[in-house]
């Protein structure tokens, strides 16, 4: 059965089976932030424009099945148009590199936020008095943050009371729960 144009990965059928593992692992390398495969290695199989579609389709496929955490049966259903050698190769790649793809997807999500905390420092100070009240005896937290935004590190300094610190901690704990749910 010939794969139909428009089904996932139909262009992969042109690839000789012995080149499948090499191509798929290089595409996963690209997803993980390393080098994607180069057209020169596959110019005898696909035209230039078709090559771009191959890369895009396979990368989307891997991201989708790992991101959705699809079971093997559902993955095989999506691959039923391909020959058994290509199906087997894809499944081996997915099983062996699933964790790497998942980490790459997490990094992509984290990178959506343009600002990232690079470093921090804190001190607790005791305010003994102010110009309005003779004796305060109130603990204050001085928090110094180095935030990387658009490649540039910007320093921020914040002074907080006990209540403000408690609110910050609660917000950070809530954000941490969301991050843990993404893993």
From Swiss-Prot:
Subcellular location(s) per record: Cytoplasm; Nucleus
Protein name: COMM domain-containing protein 8
Tissue specificity statement from the Swiss-Prot or TrEMBL entry: Widely expressed with highest expression in thyroid.
Domain of life: Eukaryota
Pfam family, one: COMMD8_HN
Predominant subcellular localization, coarse grouping: cytoplasm
Keywords: Cytoplasm, Nucleus, Transcription, Transcription regulation
Biological-process GO terms, alphabetical: signal transduction
Stored InterPro entries: COMM, COMMD4/6/7/8, COMMD8, COMMD8_HN
Location of the COMM domain: 116-183
Subunit structure: Component of the commander complex consisting of the CCC subcomplex and the retriever subcomplex. Component of the CCC (COMMD/CCDC22/CCDC93) subcomplex consisting of COMMD1, COMMD2, COMMD3, COMMD4, COMMD5, COMMD6, COMMD7, COMMD8, COMMD9, COMMD10, CCDC22 and CCDC93; within the complex forms a heterodimer with COMMD4. Interacts with RELA, RELB, NFKB1/p105. Interacts with CCDC22, CCDC93, SCNN1B, CUL1, CUL2, CUL3, CUL4A, CUL4B, CUL5.
Family named by the database record: Belongs to the COMM domain-containing protein 8 family.
GO MF annotations in UniProt: NF-kappaB binding
Disulfide bridge map: none
Reported function: Scaffold protein in the commander complex that is essential for endosomal recycling of transmembrane cargos; the commander complex is composed of the CCC subcomplex and the retriever subcomplex. May modulate activity of cullin-RING E3 ubiquitin ligase (CRL) complexes. May down-regulate activation of NF-kappa-B.
GO cellular component terms, A-Z: cytosol; nucleoplasm
Organism: Homo sapiens
């Amino acid at each position: 059965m010939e794969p139909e144009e428009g089904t996932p990965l139909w262009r992969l059928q042109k690839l000789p089976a012995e080149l499948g593992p090499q191509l798929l692992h290089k595409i996963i390398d690209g997803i993980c932030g390393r080098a994607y495969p180069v057209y020169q290695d596959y110019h005898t199989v696909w035209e230039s424009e078709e090559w771009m579609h191959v890369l895009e389709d396979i990368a989307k496929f891997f991201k989708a099945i790992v991101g959705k955490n699809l079971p093997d049966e559902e993955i095989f259903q999506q691959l039923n148009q391909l020959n058994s050698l290509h199906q087997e190769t894809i499944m081996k790649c997915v099983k062996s590199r699933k964790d790497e793809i998942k980490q790459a997807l997490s990094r992509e999500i984290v990178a959506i936020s343009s600002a990232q905390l690079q470093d921090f420092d804190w001190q607790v100070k005791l305010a003994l008095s102010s110009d309005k009240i003779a004796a305060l005896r109130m603990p204050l937290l001085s928090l110094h943050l180095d935030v990387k935004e658009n490649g540039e590190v910007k320093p921020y300094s914040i002074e907080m009371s006990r209540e403000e610190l408690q609110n910050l901690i609660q917000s950070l704990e809530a954000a941490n729960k969301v991050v843990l749910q993404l893993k």
